[in-house]
Regions:
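Flexible, solvent-exposed loop/hinge segments and secondary-structure transition points
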Residues: 1-144
Length: 144
């Protein structure tokens, strides 16, 4: 008989929309129009916003950041060996996955009890700006 967890937390649409709203609020406070994506634990899109003035070229990047964080079960960023960034591995992951794995920061996991239930991806600013907006979304999720 297979063992099945009865307590399997899932990201709801309401939760995804709360994450999205908090991230949009932060981007507005910063004066940075962003593309913001929220996905479930399988990397499937649940909520998305392209703020007025956000770069169209960043739409897929935001979605890919969220997807990568969810399916890899870690925040996005460059691949590392020890404390060193490995550019070749980072590029290999991005190319080999048709950009679904990204070495660009701005994709953060949403966790419940140490378990990934989804992720947020933000794009259109610098990596630091994208990450700051994503963190606001995560903070709303943790708080809620």
């Amino acid at each position: 008989m297979a063992h099945v967890s009865l307590n399997n937390p899932k990201l709801t649409l309401e939760g995804a929309e709360a994450v999205l709203a908090a991230a949009k609020d932060q981007a507005s406070r910063m004066g940075k129009p962003m593309n913001i994506a929220v996905v479930d634990d399988g990397g499937h899109l649940m909520a998305f916003a392209r703020m007025d003035g956000a770069k169209p070229a960043s739409i897929d990047i935001a979605i890919n950041k969220a997807h990568a964080a969810a399916i890899r079960r870690q925040d996005t960023g460059p691949a590392r060996i020890g404390n060193e960034v490995n550019v070749l591995i980072s590029l290999g992951l991005a190319i080999g996955s048709r950009a679904h794995q990204t070495p660009i920061r701005g994709g953060l996991m949403l966790e419940v009890g140490g378990q990934c239930v989804g992720a947020i991806g933000v794009s259109a600013g610098t990596e630091d700006e994208d990450t700051e907006v994503a963190r606001a979304g995560v903070a709303a999720f943790v708080k809620g």
